[in-house]
Amino acid sequence: MRFKRSCSLGVAAAIGMSVLAGAAAAKEMTTGLSFDFNRNDSGFTPIFSDYPNEQGVEEFYELRSGHEEVPIAEAGKGLFLSGNNHSDDLFMGYYKELSGLVPETEYQFNVRFQLATNVENDMIGIGGAPGESVFVKCGVVSEKPENSLDSLSHFRLNIDKGTQSQSGADMIVVGDLAKEEINRPGEYEFNEIETKVIARTDKAGTAYLVIGSDSGFEGITSYYLDDIYVSWANTSEVSVTRGDAVKMLFDHAHRWDEAVGTPTFTDVAWDAPYAEAVAWAEQNGYLGGYGNGFFGPEDMMSVEQAMVMIYRLFGSPKVTDAGVLDSYKDASQISPWARDAVAFSITNKLLVPDGKILPQSPISVKALRYAIGQIGMAD
């Protein structure tokens, strides 16, 4: 049995944007690539980092990579990585150039891959567990991943991957190396991992997919990457689920010292990537459910729902210029409970409609990121 671990939308770029949001509604248009590695490595390049620049260090750290057979029946070949974490912070991974995209454009990348590991969960190791203390990370960046030497003559990446359990601006934690199923103790099994990240292409329309591990376990770690699939869409053309939307607001506005309980909705699993965000929104009254205990985390967030959520974050201030809605022909489509929120959002330029408000339509990633990025600037 294969377990799919899903992660919510990772904001790999700064959430504030200098461009206007444009149309708020999303129109889904995606392009993708898949790699099974049965014939070759498909152009993926291995990279190791966070270790000293010393003679013979690659041998001492036992750094290995290659296009090899995955030790699982009928799995075929995959990308192998192995290293001995003497530095207590060893990063090892692969990156792949994605070319032919629109230059200097923000995309949402959906990434799915399988990781073959033979590490059982709840094991004890030096510095940390060999499973739960080896953090799997994923990101998409506009700069080719490369090493340089820091002041201590250690190899460091030119991208922000974070440190061990912490995500960085360019890579987010999407899992760990512990097996999710223990059908064959000591043998390799697949963990399936899925995530979403947001990144911007460079001037040539190029981005780089990066998948790897950041280790806190001071020992040998070995694993295989296989069946990597990546798709992308312009953030103005992809919609946001209610769960992901709340998580985006939570990541931007939640205070580190603000206690958060657990969600009471029956359709929000306690370990869902957006569970804490939903609980936070619920306990503060920013966004409710549908009734009967349902939140609908996988439903699309509408434009008016998103504006209500942000409006309530501001404390639902009195709206003195509701007439701002009169200039939009589809203003009559706004639900009564959302009219003040939409008016407030337009007045304060949280929402910048392109001729129409489209209140019932799914909000785009770009429009929601723009609105959240304006928090702190509104009156």
What are these regions (language model features)?
Residues 187-190, 201-202, 215-232, 361-362:
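Extracellular carbohydrate recognition
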Residues 178, 210-219:
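Short beta-strand-plus-loop segments that form exposed binding edges in beta-rich domains
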Residues 63-93:
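Surface-exposed, low-complexity/disordered Ser/Thr/Gly/Pro/Asn-rich loops and linkers
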Residues 152-206:
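Short, surface-exposed tryptophan/glycine-enriched loops
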Residues 86-102, 191-195:
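Short beta-strands within extracellular/lumenal beta-sheet-rich domains
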Residues 27-56:
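Extracellular carbohydrate-recognition regions
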Residues 18-25, 234-276, 283-339, 347, ...:
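Feature responds to low-complexity, polar/acidic, surface-exposed segments characteristic
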Residues 106-120, 213:
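A short beta-strand element within beta-rich, extracytoplasmic domains
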